[in-house]
């Protein structure tokens, strides 16, 4: 005989589905909260481990009243310049070598170059405002602003000239503007696959449009998403999965650690947004006279057909030809003592891929600057 419990009505199917859906949503919400908390905790701990693993290389200097609240990191190594060099006697001047990085690369990116140059010269790399161990700087982030900050940094740090100045990629803009602003400081220059003030205008139309789209500032939603990914450790995880090629993993990990802060992202974006203004400042900087100059040019392109979309192999061949045979050659002619060297087995990141060629170029310009009357 059926019991009373057996005679209870069965809940409708719709009601059971609602119940299961509610439980599922509760479970997913709990899982999401757990993932967010776990990701944030992971990133919090990892950042503090980074601070222990990768202590500051160099020293921070406040730039003074002209640049309130701006502190830049300067990393100098090698022998101090001769204290009583007589500029009237050839061979007695000991220039200091100054290194300026490409867009998005902290001062530590010069490590392979700086370690070798320090064996024969005083050499300094620095983090531009917002990079590495430096504070954020005022907007706009043009090459003129960057040059003025570098000049103030060298003054407060007591790193006296003259200088052999070296610029990679966007750093080439900065060192040329610096030379135009402070010509008596500079006795020689090395440009390492350096940006050219006419490079955007000289690109084929398809690539110009693609690069313009790529350089369009991100939307507020994209910036928020990037910030969330950074705070939850997602950026860190993605970087850890990347191919480091032939570079030492410890070197790449330290570069990544310096690139993760929000201020770094803001600084690189600000420099990119001011690229056209910086190019105009380079045009106004003038030439180098008879200063020794070496232009290092990457022999290998960085893009493949279809990247960006719509770009053909012919477009890329045209870009490479214009870059190697025209724009880079024109930089060689900035000085009556200019020289160009193609680094056939390197792409754009010559300081990473062939640092020995950068060291050799610096050594040659350094020696020529010492011998100048």
Named regions from a protein language model:
Residues 25-60:
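An N-terminal hydrophobic leader/cap segment in hydrolases
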Residues 77-133:
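Conserved HGGG/HGGXW glycine-rich cap/lid loop of the alpha/beta-hydrolase fold
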Residues 143, 147, 182-186, 190-327, ...:
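Flexible "cap/lid" subdomain of the alpha/beta-hydrolase fold that forms the substrate-access gate
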Residues 64-67, 75-82, 88, 128-166:
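Active-site loop/oxyanion-hole signature of alpha/beta-hydrolase fold enzymes
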Residues 50-71, 81:
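N-terminal cap/lid segment of alpha/beta-hydrolase-fold proteins
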Residues 98-102, 168, 193:
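The conserved beta1-alpha1 loop
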Residues 7, 14-15, 326, 334-373:
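Catalytic active-site module of serine/aspartate enzymes centered on a nucleophile-bearing elbow/loop
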Residues 167-171, 175:
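Gly/Ala-rich beta-loop-alpha elbow adjacent to hydrolase catalytic centers
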């Amino acid at each position: 005989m059926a019991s009373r419990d057996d005679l209870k009505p069965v809940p409708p199917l719709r009601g059971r589905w609602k119940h299961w859906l509610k439980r599922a949503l509760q479970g997913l919400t709990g899982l999401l909260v757990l993932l967010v908390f776990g990701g944030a905790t992971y990133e919090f701990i990892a950042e503090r481990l980074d601070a222990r693993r990768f202590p500051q290389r160099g020293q921070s200097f406040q730039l003074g009243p002209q640049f309130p609240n701006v502190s830049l990191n300067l990393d100098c190594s090698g022998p101090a310049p001769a204290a009583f060099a007589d500029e009237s006697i050839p061979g007695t001047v000991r220039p200091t070598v100054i290194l300026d990085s490409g867009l998005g690369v902290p001062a530590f990116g010069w490590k392979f170059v700086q370690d070798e140059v320090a064996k024969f010269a005083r050499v300094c790399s620095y983090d531009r405002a917002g990079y590495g161990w430096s504070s954020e700087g005022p907007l706009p982030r043009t090459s003129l602003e960057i040059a003025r900050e570098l000049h103030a940094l060298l003054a407060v740090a007591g790193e006296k000239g003259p200088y052999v100045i070296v610029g990679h990629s966007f750093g080439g803009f900065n060192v040329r503007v610096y030379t135009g602003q402070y010509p008596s400081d500079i006795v020689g220059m090395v440009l390492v696959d350096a940006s050219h003030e006419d490079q955007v205008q000289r690109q084929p139309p398809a690539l110009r449009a693609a690069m313009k789209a790529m350089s369009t500032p991100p939307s507020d939603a994209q910036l928020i998403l990037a910030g969330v990914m950074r705070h939850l450790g997602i950026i860190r995880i993605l970087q850890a999965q990347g191919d480091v090629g032939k570079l030492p993993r410890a070197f790449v990990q330290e570069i990544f650690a310096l690139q993760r802060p929000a201020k770094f992202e803001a600084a690189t974006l600000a420099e990119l947004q001011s690229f056209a203004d910086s190019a105009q400042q380079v045009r106004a900087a003038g030439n180098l006279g008879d200063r020794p100059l070496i232009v290092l040019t990457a022999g290998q392109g960085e893009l493949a057909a279809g990247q960006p979309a719509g770009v053909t192999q012919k477009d890329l061949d045209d870009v490479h030809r214009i870059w190697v045979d025209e724009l880079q050659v024109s930089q060689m002619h900035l000085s009556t003592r200019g020289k160009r060297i193609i680094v056939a087995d390197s792409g754009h990141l010559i300081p990473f891929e062939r640092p020995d060629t950068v060291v050799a170029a610096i050594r040659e310009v350094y020696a020529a600057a010492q011998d100048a009357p």
